[in-house]
């Protein structure tokens, strides 16, 4: 496995692979890998001749009061997991390499960015779209995989790729969960034992909403109120949002008449956790 930190070297590697007729699969990460990332990496391994995994904690997607400096990092463990998952290359640039002095270009995908996490993190998806566009230009993949746990992020990337005619196939991979249902996240490490118990209410709330939907309930307010009751009864939970939205536009839906996503964000202790479930017949 090769470790590349220079953009020029990364581009050279990918250009050479493409000239040989090889396909490139790409998994972008911020490191501190867990089984959810490993699932993405192993799936990507089957989709290309070469597999590139990026590890880059992107400062421009964090707000001024968010956890950029505290975000967990473990390079040695991440490198081992990438190798065990079959990665050919880890692309791990520095912040200075990605954003040199004078950098000033940003990509905004306004409509799908506005709702959900965009309400409380107004610059987050601008940072996500910008770094992903740069990573695509560095790694030059044919296919890129993203987890569906970050449903809004996936929607933003799909919209950007569509609007800018980026010739990369974007694949969403279902959320990987711990045995008790908690969606895997690097931020789960922030949780104490008691907070982890409270966090299980997120998946329980989504599961109950899904059961109601499958039983015929189409009123989004009923589903939201049900989920809210399950979460608020747990100690230490502060709901940022619970919403039911159109799966493509991410605009709020009152009555569910086509596929929708119930998405939520909840603060528990130091962690802000997100999760979602798609509601479709």
Where are these regions (language model features)?
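Phosphate/ribose-recognition catalytic cores of enzymes acting on nucleotide-derived substrates
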Residues: 226-281
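Nucleotidyltransferase catalytic core that binds NTPs
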Residues: 2-236, 245-249, 278
């Amino acid at each position: 496995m090769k470790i590349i930190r220079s953009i020029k070297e990364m581009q050279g590697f990918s250009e050479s692979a493409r000239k040989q007729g090889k396909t490139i699969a790409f998994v972008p990460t911020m490191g501190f890998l867990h089984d959810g990332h490993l699932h993405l990496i192993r799936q990507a391994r089957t989709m290309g001749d070469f597999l590139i995994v990026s590890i880059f904690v992107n400062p421009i997607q964090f707000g001024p009061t968010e956890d950029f400096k505290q975000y967990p990092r473990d390079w040695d463990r991440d490198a081992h997991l990438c190798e065990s998952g079959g990665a050919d290359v880890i692309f791990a640039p520095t912040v200075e390499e990605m954003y040199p002095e004078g950098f000033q270009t940003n990509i905004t995908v306004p409509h799908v960015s506005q709702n959900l996490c965009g309400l409380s993190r107004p610059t987050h998806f601008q940072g996500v779209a910008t770094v992903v566009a740069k990573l695509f230009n560095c790694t030059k993949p044919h296919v890129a995989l993203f987890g569906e746990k970050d449903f809004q992020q996936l929607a933003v990337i799909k919209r950007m790729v569509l609007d800018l005619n980026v010739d990369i196939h974007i694949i969403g991979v279902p959320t990987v969960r711990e045995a008790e249902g908690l969606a895997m996240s690097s931020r789960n490490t922030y949780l104490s034992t008691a907070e982890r118990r409270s966090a299980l209410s997120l998946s329980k709330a989504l599961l109950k909403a899904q059961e109601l939907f499958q039983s015929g309930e189409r009123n989004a307010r009923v589903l939201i109120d049900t989920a809210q009751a399950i979460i608020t009864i747990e100690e230490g939970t502060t709901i940022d949002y619970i919403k039911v939205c159109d799966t493509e536009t991410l605009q709020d839906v009152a009555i569910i008449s086509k596929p929708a996503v119930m998405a939520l964000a909840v603060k528990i202790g130091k962690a802000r956790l997100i999760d979602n479930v798609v509601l479709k017949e």
